[in-house]
């Protein structure tokens, strides 16, 4: 009997950083802090590399720098996404680039049955592409029901309050 537990890899997309910006960021910080000693869970956290709300890992104790765009914190692999300064479209760009990076990491490292958790769905029409890609890689996608797209992209119409 194999006593080695299989590691569950969980990719977190949608927070700009860990604990320094808002609700999603605090959630990710606390989640990784709580599970940092669990050997059977490995978190991979997308972080914004530049601009408003970007990740500044130098403000945290216990960070192990891997390179300019990757570090370990709370036993989580954190990777930074460069985002062009393109106004409100930054959020969409960031989520799409983060999901692309997750898929590349899963492929490159042959990660079995990964979980990708999207905290804020700002990817709209790109969602089905990434769902298919992640499912093809043997993964599961979870979308936060409090994300920002449920009505807009489900109906393809803007509610009255958004017109």
Specify the residue positions occupied by each region the protein language model found:
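A generic structural motif
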Residues: 38-44, 111-112, 138-139
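Short, well-ordered alpha-helices that flank and scaffold nucleotide-derived cofactor binding pockets
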Residues: 29, 33, 37, 100, ...
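Nucleotide-sugar donor phosphate/pyrophosphate-binding loop at the beta->alpha transition
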Residues: 139-140, 150-163
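N-terminal strand-loop element at the rim of the active site
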Residues: 7, 12-21, 34-89, 122
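Local beta-strand N-terminus motif with an aromatic residue
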Residues: 7, 111-114
